């Protein structure tokens, strides 16, 4: 489907390690109507549609778009050290410009807010970090500059 320009592949990028990861890529439909038809109009999750729409808009604006991953070290309930992988929905590059974007249809709970913002907080550079939410929301910056 990629050869027919129906889907586009987005590679996984290790943000801290600054390299591409050899894990499964993510695919986005170039036409959401064809996506829905392919799925027989059964899966209309607004979160997936919104993420696909954002990807298409970023590509239209000339960005190279990857899926980001941030690896962190944490302690589990037993106090043992473990590695966790946090996802960043989009790592967007155009020339020297880089933007990190999280897509969240709704941030109704504290847990969901923490999940969406945590990966962006762990990126220690001065590039722009954005969380795009569904619906009509006022634009604002939090204390972390996100």
Where are these regions (language model features)?
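A cross-kingdom feature that marks ATP-driven nucleic-acid transaction machinery
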Residues: 5-6, 10-146
């Amino acid at each position: 489907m990629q050869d027919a320009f129906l889907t586009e592949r987005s590679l996984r990028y290790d943000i801290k390690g600054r390299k591409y990861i050899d894990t499964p890529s993510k695919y986005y439909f170039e036409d959401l109507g064809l996506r829905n038809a392919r799925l027989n109009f059964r899966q209309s999750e607004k979160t997936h549609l919104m993420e696909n729409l954002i990807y298409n808009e970023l590509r239209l604006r000339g960005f190279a778009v990857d899926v980001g991953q941030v690896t962190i070290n944490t302690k589990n309930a037993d106090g043992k050290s473990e590695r966790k992988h946090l996802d960043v929905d989009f790592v967007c590059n155009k020339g020297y410009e880089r933007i990190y974007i999280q897509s969240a249809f709704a941030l109704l709970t504290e847990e969901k807010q923490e999940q969406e913002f945590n990966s962006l907080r762990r990126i220690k550079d001065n590039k722009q970090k954005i969380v795009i939410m569904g619906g009509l929301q006022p634009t604002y910056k939090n204390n972390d500059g996100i």
